[in-house]
């Protein structure tokens, strides 16, 4: 049983790495359909990655080893995060060594290294993007921590695998505070992954750039790894949302191969729905001014606080 657990573990990581560009391509395709535009092929991210990997890297003369190493660090960090998230099965050996708080720390580590690399060259755009990225992260982390704290009050644990197992063994555990947490989580997902209304990865206007400003100096394999890591981060956030709010179908400990195949099919359906929802949100939303981002993240934080208050009030009434 121990050996099969490691098979599921590495299988989930490989699955996340392989499906992440496809998930990004699906979102781009859905957004194009909703905006009445010709949709790019769903495999377009793979083609872009292949083209970038086939090019020769061009680096600035004053680029340090940090600048060259950060793309690999970002990709490895996102792959490690994928090993902690129960997207298909909960029997994950690596997940026992880290909980949701450690997962937030991994994302923060990746953000820190990317900001340092953006400032390493000394360009104005890189420094601008790094400062804005750190500001967004500083505002988003309290909200996502409150989301996980909400889950902790429900299940008494911050381990994602234990949360999913609790959902499976206690399917009647439904709390209105989960709705507030889900709304706040979607807002954090949009902010942390450079999506509209916080950021627009398709633009290169200096007044609106955040993520793109940090990667302007990268090319070839380095840019490919950064783009792949960005897709993997979005995929990881989607899987976190699935594990927290719609975990039904995920195979629990001791599941057989048939249950894992069913869980894989359920994951693909959930990802398709999540991608369509994200595309809809981006299609009906307008890009916010950078100075409005703190208000957006403050709203996410307050929504989670309201969810906690609802949970505590309902718990007090139930106890009474």
What are these regions (language model features)?
Residues 277-304:
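Interfacial loop-to-transmembrane junctions
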Residues 150-180:
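Juxtamembrane/interfacial segments at transmembrane-helix boundaries in multi-pass membrane proteins
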Residues 8-23, 95-108, 171-192, 262-263:
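Alpha-helical transmembrane segments
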Residues 21-30, 108-118, 183-200, 272-283:
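Transmembrane alpha-helical segments that form the membrane-embedded catalytic/substrate-channel core
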Residues 48-67, 123-128, 215-222:
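Cytosolic juxtamembrane amphipathic/interface segments immediately preceding
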């Amino acid at each position: 049983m121990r050996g099969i657990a490691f098979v599921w573990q590495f299988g989930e990581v490989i699955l996340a790495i392989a499906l992440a560009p496809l998930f990004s391509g699906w979102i781009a395709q859905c957004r194009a359909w909703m905006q009445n535009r010709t949709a790019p092929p769903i495999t377009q991210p793979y083609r872009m990655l292949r083209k970038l990997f086939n090019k020769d890297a061009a680096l600035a003369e004053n680029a340090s080893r940090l600048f060259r190493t950060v793309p690999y660090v970002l990709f490895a960090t996102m792959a490690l995060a994928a090993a902690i998230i129960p997207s298909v099965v909960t029997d994950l050996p690596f997940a026992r060594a880290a909980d949701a708080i450690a997962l937030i720390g991994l994302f923060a580590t990746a953000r820190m290294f990317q900001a340092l690399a953006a400032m390493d060259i000394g360009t104005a755009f890189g420094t601008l993007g790094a400062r804005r990225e750190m500001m967004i992260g500083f505002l988003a982390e309290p909200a996502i921590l409150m989301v996980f704290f909400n889950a902790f009050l429900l299940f008494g644990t911050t381990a994602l695998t234990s949360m999913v197992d609790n959902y499976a063994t206690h399917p009647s555990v439904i709390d209105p505070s989960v709705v507030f947490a889900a709304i706040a989580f979607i807002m954090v997902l949009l902010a942390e992954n450079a999506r509209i209304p916080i950021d627009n990865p398709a633009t290169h206007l200096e007044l609106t750039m955040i993520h793109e400003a940090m990667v302007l100096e990268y090319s070839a394999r380095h840019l490919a790894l950064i783009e792949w890591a960005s897709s993997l981060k979005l995929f990881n956030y989607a899987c976190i949302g699935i594990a927290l709010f719609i975990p039904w179908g995920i195979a629990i400990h001791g599941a057989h191969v048939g249950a894992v195949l069913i869980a894989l099919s359920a994951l693909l359906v959930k990802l398709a729905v999540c991608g369509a929802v994200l595309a809809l949100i981006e299609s009906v939303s307008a890009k916010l001014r950078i100075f409005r981002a703190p208000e957006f993240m403050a709203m996410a934080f307050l929504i989670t606080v309201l969810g906690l208050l609802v949970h505590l009030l309902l718990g007090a009434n139930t106890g009474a």
